[in-house]
Amino acid sequence: MVNPLIKEAKEKMKKTLEKIEDELKKMRTGKPSPAILEEIKVDYYGVPTPVNQLATISVSEERTLVIKPWDRSVLSLIEKAINASDLGLNPVNDGNVIRLVFPTPTTEQREKWVKKAKEIVEEGKIAIRNIRREIMKKIKEDQKEGNIPEDDARRLENEVQKLTDEFIEKLDEVFEIKKKEIMEF
């Protein structure tokens, strides 16, 4: 049976890993990805609505995203929302769809994105280590209170450390994949 503290640590670390993966997906790279539009909201009848709930977003050609709204009346609203965002892309509205052409990024831009990805992953590592510290503290408290013997406490601490190492390694792998994606032409 898995100890509840180990289970708690694993669940929290897994959530942290998923959060970091989601943040990296939303990051702009040289390739177009519908995920970068997830944070862009359009004022649709007074309600801030994500673009992906108002349109079909697809990748067309090598460096183009095509946004095809289900209701053509929102074309200009989507265009304004993209212009107001910090994506640095110029939407082209042809009356039916909006095209977002991704320019080939410079080496300097790519290096900046890699640096940003590294910062995001570092935040994840810090969160994982904080989870480890929190669980280790609970193990020590349980041991002090006499709820678990010293040998079991040491075994649990080793398990928590092993989990920590495992998740930090996964974060490093996620970073390497993102770095490769950013740097490839």
From Swiss-Prot:
Primary location class: cytoplasm
An annotated GO cellular component: cytoplasm
Keyword Ribosomal protein (UniProt): no
Alphabetical UniProt keywords: Cytoplasm, Protein biosynthesis
One of the record's GO molecular function terms: ribosomal large subunit binding
GO biological-process terms attached to the record: translational termination
Domain of life from the UniProt record: Bacteria
InterPro entries (alphabetical): Ribosome_recyc_fac, Ribosome_recyc_fac_dom, RRF_sf
Cell compartment(s), UniProt: Cytoplasm
Coiled coil: none
Family listed: Belongs to the RRF family.
Summary of the function given for this chain in its UniProt record: Responsible for the release of ribosomes from messenger RNA at the termination of protein biosynthesis. May increase the efficiency of translation by recycling ribosomes from one round of translation to another.
Protein name: Ribosome-recycling factor
Protein source organism: Thermotoga neapolitana (strain ATCC 49049 / DSM 4359 / NBRC 107923 / NS-E)
